[in-house]
Amino acid sequence: MAVPKKRTSRSKTRIKKQIWKSQADKMALKALSLAKSVLSGKSKSFSYDVVEKSIDTN
């Protein structure tokens, strides 16, 4: 016979939610830092094509 699980307390729920949010904040900060590095051109770990646009004025 199936027995219902006990309800998770509010404190445990809030703790798990806070851990999840803090991990997401860390990942977002890391992504922002990486984007700044790539845009500044100081990144050594990525290779990407630089497209130069030439303006033709006649």
From Swiss-Prot:
Q: Name one Pfam family in it.
A: Ribosomal_L32p
Alphabetically sorted, this entry's keywords are: Chloroplast, Plastid, Ribonucleoprotein, Ribosomal protein
- Its transmembrane ranges are none
Which superkingdom?
Eukaryota
The processes (GO biological process) annotated in the record are: translation
A GO molecular function assigned to this protein is: structural constituent of ribosome
Location(s), subcellular: Plastid, Chloroplast
Keyword Chloroplast annotated: yes
Q: Name one GO cellular component term.
A: chloroplast
HAMAP family from the UniProt entry: Ribosomal_bL32 (MF_00340)
Q: Which family does it belong to?
A: Belongs to the bacterial ribosomal protein bL32 family.
Please identify the protein, giving its name as recorded: Large ribosomal subunit protein bL32c
Q: Which organism is it from?
A: Chaetosphaeridium globosum
**What is the taxonomic lineage of the source species?**
Eukaryota, Viridiplantae, Streptophyta, Coleochaetophyceae, Coleochaetales
The gene is rpl32
